[in-house]
Amino acid sequence: MLPRLLRRRAHRRETPAPARRRTRPAALAVLGAATLVLVGACADAGTGDQPQAAQNPPDLAQFYDQQLQWGPCADYAPTADDAQTYADPQFDCTRVTVPQDYARPGDGKTMQIALLRKKATGAKIGSLFADPGGPGASGTSFVARQASTWATNGLGDRFDLVGFDPRGTGASQPRIQCLTDAENDEERTKVFADPSPAGVAAAEADSRQFAERCTQRTGADVLANVGTRDVAKDMDVMRAAVGDQKMTYAGFSYGTELGTAYAEAFPQNVRALLLDGAIDPTQSTIDSTVKQNAGFQLAFDNFAKDCTSRPGCPLGTDPATATQAFQTVMRPLIDTPAQVSDGRVLSFSDAQTGVSQALYVSQLWPALQQGISQVANGNGDLLMRLADLYHERDDQGRYSNMLQAFQSISCVNQPALKEPSEALELATRADEAAPFRSTGRGPVGARDACAFWPVPPTSEPHTPKVDGLPPVVVVSVTGDPATPYQAGVDLAQQLNGSLIAVNGNQHTASLQGDACTDTLAIDYLVNLTLPPQGAECTLAPS
């Protein structure tokens, strides 16, 4: 039987896996104990229970003033695996109508944003909206799975817990759709490791085909309006539709990007923003990708130190040679995939995906050690299971649209790398930053699907302008592979916010059972009490 951790899902943003044609998210955030180290005195920002009324845009009155009809959630489950959870009567669901294009709110084209709610059990402050990241992850699924934890830590007493599926994702309508299940399976077998002109051309042809399929099956008009800035506007409509005067929000990983965008667009409507696993809005695609690859190499190196100290480590006994030993095991998969017991084969791409999934939390290091050992013996079962979780593929071979939404949203969130020289620079620097991911055949300077996207981006790297924003809190983990620690430091400065530094090896830390981080985060969300300057938590070792 697989370890319990391997049967859980969460969603976070990640950069391209090597030898793939498109960027991919990955995640498996888990819980850990923590200890608290505090420096300085608490600053109280007040309770904020009686905020001033928000001023809603008059041209959007039909959306801001809509009356929601809540009902059972069974039909909102984004995957078959979620069906039982969504059937729980403690949850109710609805869809909020928003304009497809906020520049043309009266043209009759709308989208339906799915919401899942667990009502507050005590003296209610308002709603706590939450997003787990991606982009492309289901916020309704996230809140449904976190509700039992949040119900016992004080949040469920004071807030309606509300998850939402950002436009194009999960149970929201219309959904982004690019690939069939069979096409998804086929894509995962492909490896683009040939740096020659012919190899680059093949990779780019695959990227172009993906962009064409997304356009044909979703529509360019939808793809043009799924960016972060659009979702931030949806969030304000949601706030008003549930009856809240101010926004209380917890965003994780890419969810911090949503929170930042909301802060820029509606600073006057913010009550509290908790942003954990920060995306730095000033970074370019190349810089953020390279830094994230460096973060994963650090996570691999930390894993290797642990593995080489244990008996039976497939990487040997010397952490200094662990990357080379890992490459020796993995690189043969480029030409000869490993067998999987269900009849599929584990490609080099899927193997790297499974490894990245396991690097998100140190609790998965024993499983990763076992998975690498299996591959060394021609067995791809465990790493394939990890890759399936990453791709949200169930046992019947059905996929959610998370990864397709990830690509589609990413392509409108930042300018594409349209020049071959830019693609080669990215591939070269990413290889250098994360040698454990390298094919050993040289960087493949192929442009990804965004270079062939049918619509232009709606955002670009910038320094956020947040005049009038109330105090916010940013959480950043020192050993976070997907959203490196420094990005949290930088975002806290950009938003004039408070930082909670967490020492540990995992992606995000708050509201997941970590006593130290949770104490600070919950006190902020409930009482608006800011953490002391220099607040620091240390996760207990796994």
Question: Where are each of the predicted segments found?
Answer:
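Short beta-strand/loop motif that positions the catalytic acidic residue
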Residues: 468, 473-476
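A catalytic-pocket lid/entrance helix-loop region that shapes and gates access to the active site
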Residues: 177-191, 263-325, 370-395
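Alpha/beta-hydrolase fold nucleophile elbow
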Residues: 244-254
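C-terminal motif of bacterial Sec signal peptides marking the signal peptidase cleavage site
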Residues: 37-41
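Alpha/beta-hydrolase fold active-site neighborhood
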Residues: 61-62, 323-469, 513, 519
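Catalytic-loop region of hydrolases
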Residues: 2-9, 13, 19-30, 42-192, ...
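Conserved alpha/beta-hydrolase "acid-adjacent" motif
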Residues: 481-486
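Conserved acidic catalytic loop of the alpha/beta-hydrolase fold
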Residues: 217, 232-246
